[in-house]
Amino acid sequence: MGYFRCARAGSFGRRRKMEPSTAARAWALFWLLLPLLGAVCASGPRTLVLLDNLNVRETHSLFFRSLKDRGFELTFKTADDPSLSLIKYGEFLYDNLIIFSPSVEDFGGNINVETISAFIDGGGSVLVAASSDIGDPLRELGSECGIEFDEEKTAVIDHHNYDISDLGQHTLIVADTENLLKAPTIVGKSSLNPILFRGVGMVADPDNPLVLDILTGSSTSYSFFPDKPITQYPHAVGKNTLLIAGLQARNNARVIFSGSLDFFSDSFFNSAVQKAAPGSQRYSQTGNYELAVALSRWVFKEEGVLRVGPVSHHRVGETAPPNAYTVTDLVEYSIVIQQLSNGKWVPFDGDDIQLEFVRIDPFVRTFLKKKGGKYSVQFKLPDVYGVFQFKVDYNRLGYTHLYSSTQVSVRPLQHTQYERFIPSAYPYYASAFSMMLGLFIFSIVFLHMKEKEKSD
């Protein structure tokens, strides 16, 4: 106690001022750390790029430059780098993962198929580009996501839709834009030139409803060894041949698989394209760049991201929600839905958003109408009491799953709220009153009627 008393007396009795040299050092340290703090706050999405070799950074520079121009912070490493790590102390070190290393046989460091799957389960975005020299890790990762790659050294072959510069194996495919998924949020809104593709084919797991067939082969395409005669049924044939596939998991994590690493290359971006068939139109440039940018915007959640804003509900004519609604109340429900556009949240424009009023099953299902930046609707509560939910469950192709649920209680009418006379019971009322009236008349007649006396 004596030491504590002396310490307090010393601290309160004499207040020492900070020496000028100490204050100067503190201010100097603050100004030195300020730019670093600003840089950390302003950094874009952290993206790890795994390459077979660092030369890929030069051969695919246009694609990487498009990411940097949009603010992405790219970290380039070879796929077998022993220092690789996605997770540290239970936290993800990166927001996105790009795998441009199709021939990798073993990832370096702490990265493997299990950690990549955990990264996806945690909401991370992954872009994978394969080739005919595909290794087992990418094949296993595809299986985890409902995608099955063909064997190593196979390629997609199309004897009717190959480019004029093909070397004779008909593996340089010209994919028509009609084979693209009809989802502008994923593939872009602008019309594209034909797509140039050279790589391995894929097929989707028919039992996985989350797989998206982004770009398919034509009806004449198939996947096989280009330098061997066909002795067995090919792994993928016709429209079932996937060139680019996608996946949006139930936690809104997104993954894209491309069977062609060349699809993202500068040479394919800048190449002219023309089918070898006589009379085919020649295009000065492929549509690869525009499609690659659109796919990257979607997979890295720059497009198609929705969120729920303020939600309100109340009786019509009031402004605040009650503690409990009463059956057959006329209520108004409104919700704000926003969409991420160019890094900013803007009102979402949709005409197919539905509201459900659910107990166990929906009792009311109605469309929400846009009004003044929010979606609202008025409806009458059912004549059923219990615990209900205002539920908006919006799940559309290319958009993140939007879900909002608000629980409310609906009670029956109070004793004083019931009608005195129910119209459907009027016949019974008439029967009761007529019987009362009849009894009254009978009583009067019976009491006042005097029998005649018998004469002797």
From Swiss-Prot:
Pathway: Protein modification; protein glycosylation. GO terms for cellular component: azurophil granule membrane; endoplasmic reticulum; endoplasmic reticulum membrane; intracellular membrane-bounded organelle; membrane; oligosaccharyltransferase complex; oligosaccharyltransferase complex A; oligosaccharyltransferase complex B. InterPro entries: DDOST_48_kDa_subunit, OST48_MD, OST48_N. One of its GO terms (molecular function) is enzyme activator activity. Residues 1-42 form the signal peptide. GO terms for biological process: protein glycosylation; protein N-linked glycosylation; protein N-linked glycosylation via asparagine; regulation of protein stability; response to cytokine; T cell activation. It is linked to Congenital disorder of glycosylation 1R: A form of congenital disorder of glycosylation, a multisystem disorder caused by a defect in glycoprotein biosynthesis and characterized by under-glycosylated serum glycoproteins. Congenital disorders of glycosylation result in a wide variety of clinical features, such as defects in the nervous system development, psychomotor retardation, dysmorphic features, hypotonia, coagulation disorders, and immunodeficiency. Component of the oligosaccharyltransferase (OST) complex. OST exists in two different complex forms which contain common core subunits RPN1, RPN2, OST48, OST4, DAD1 and TMEM258, either STT3A or STT3B as catalytic subunits, and form-specific accessory subunits. STT3A complex assembly occurs through the formation of 3 subcomplexes. Subcomplex 1 contains RPN1 and TMEM258, subcomplex 2 contains the STT3A-specific subunits STT3A, DC2/OSTC, and KCP2 as well as the core subunit OST4, and subcomplex 3 contains RPN2, DAD1, and OST48. This is Dolichyl-diphosphooligosaccharide--protein glycosyltransferase 48 kDa subunit. It comes from Homo sapiens (Human). The lineage of its organism: Eukaryota, Metazoa, Chordata, Craniata, Vertebrata.
